[in-house]
């Protein structure tokens, strides 16, 4: 991917900040934003803060949790200004290939919709898998932008450093909003980020192998209590179905109270997350091992009320 550093990319105080500034720069009250469900909550919240309407697109297991915009009605398309995509995905761990991004760019160009790709987990991948970027697609910069973050790539969560790249007009609009809200990034943080980017990248292979080991520990622990989850190719999460007879909230609460193990109920990420848990791979390996040991020792019966469909 080639970018004009003066026009087609800008630094952010973390990509989350950029999500909110993007919506302030590009949306008007009454505009529609197409948001996945389940999804990272700031996509929806930032749109609502800008006065926009949110139209959700369900991520379905039978479609490998890939967005399908074919069902969006003509009326919604006329008012739609943004579409959020996020692969490797939070919370599902799903990935998207180059053809998906080609279709997304074509969809955005056809309907005048800005395609907003959140690629925070683009460098957290396993078993030789290499995630694609939407900006690799020819013509993408005419209708797309991409967020990246040092938080996940370089283990720098809390340093608050990210980037927005792609469409030059959108980059300029975000810079204008930012110039009225913040005064830039601390020089020490930018120096650390530059050192991370310019330094030896081979350690990322070892780091990702560590995440893959934790992923396998989680999958084995879940299988021991009858939960079969799809092994993610990338991201920091395992997206696991809850046992029959449980809701996401009820099972997460049961795990916390009975075993002391904390999982995120899928409903935190939207109604489409019902029936699932998000399990993070960010804890130390020894803690993951202990959590799975406790999971294996858990014995109880499901509640009387069935899990909602």
Regions from the PLM with identified roles:
Residues 1-309:
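PLP-dependent class I/II
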């Amino acid at each position: 991917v080639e970018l004009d550093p003066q026009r087609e990319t800008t630094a952010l105080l973390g990509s989350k900040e950029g999500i909110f500034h993007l919506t302030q720069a590009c949306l008007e009250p009454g505009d529609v934003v197409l948001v996945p469900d389940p999804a990272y909550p700031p996509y929806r919240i930032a749109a609502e803060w800008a006065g926009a309407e949110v139209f959700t697109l369900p991520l379905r297991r039978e479609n490998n949790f890939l967005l399908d915009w074919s069902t969006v009605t003509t009326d919604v398309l006329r008012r739609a200004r943004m579409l959020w995509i996020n692969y490797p995905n939070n919370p599902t761990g799903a990935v998207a290939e180059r053809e998906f991004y080609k279709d997304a760019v074509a969809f955005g160009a056809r309907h005048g919709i800005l395609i907003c790709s959140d690629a925070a987990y683009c460098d957290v991948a396993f078993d030789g898998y290499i995630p694609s970027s939407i900006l690799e697609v020819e013509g993408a910069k005419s209708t797309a932008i991409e967020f990246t973050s040092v938080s996940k790539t370089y283990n720098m969560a809390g340093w608050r450093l990210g980037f927005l790249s792609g469409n030059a007009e959108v980059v300029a609009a975000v810079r204008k909003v930012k110039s009225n809200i913040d005064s830039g990034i601390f020089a020490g943080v930018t120096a650390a980020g530059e050192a991370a980017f310019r330094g030896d990248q081979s350690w990322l292979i070892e780091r990702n192998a560590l995440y893959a080991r934790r992923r396998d520990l989680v999958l084995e622990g879940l299988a021991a209590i009858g939960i079969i989850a799809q092994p993610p190719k990338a991201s920091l999460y395992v997206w696991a179905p809850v046992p029959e007879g449980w809701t996401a909230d009820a099972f997460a609460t049961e795990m916390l109270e009975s075993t002391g193990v904390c999982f995120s109920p899928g409903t935190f990420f939207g109604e489409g997350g019902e029936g699932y848990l998000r399990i993070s791979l960010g804890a130390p390996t020894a803690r993951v091992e202990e959590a799975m040991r406790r999971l294996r020792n858990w014995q109880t019966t499901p509640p009387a009320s069935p899990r909602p469909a």
